[in-house]
């Protein structure tokens, strides 16, 4: 776990090892891909400077931008394969190669 601040005071992100390498679960540090990809903080922020520093930290902790998973982006469900046929549209495998 790594403290990033930004959206709320005390916010943390998780760095996890997968078969693809180091991934970062951004949780609320980045709601959407566009937030960290385009360096676009969202409106409800405790401290903008901490949020921007959090984007830099995520980039440094993850093996690539494709290894950062935002907390609320529906695109996650499109960019990663389902955990199983029965879980299609419900659960995806973040350790699998992305579909994009």
Labelled PLM ranges:
Residues 3, 11-80:
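Metallo-beta-lactamase
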Residues 78-99:
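Short, electropositive alpha-helical surface patch
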Residues 54, 99-100:
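Binuclear metal-dependent phosphoesterase catalytic core
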């Amino acid at each position: 776990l790594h403290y990033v601040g930004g959206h709320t005071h005390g916010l943390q992100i998780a760095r996890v090892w997968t078969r693809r390498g180091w991934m970062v679960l951004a949780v609320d540090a980045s709601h959407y891909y566009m937030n960290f990809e385009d360096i676009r903080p969202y409106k409800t922020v405790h401290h903008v400077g901490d949020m921007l520093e959090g984007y830099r930290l995520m980039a440094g902790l993850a093996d690539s931008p494709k290894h950062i998973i935002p907390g609320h982006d529906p695109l996650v469900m499109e960019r990663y394969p389902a955990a199983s046929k029965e879980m299609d549209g419900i659960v995806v495998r973040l350790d699998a190669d992305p579909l994009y």
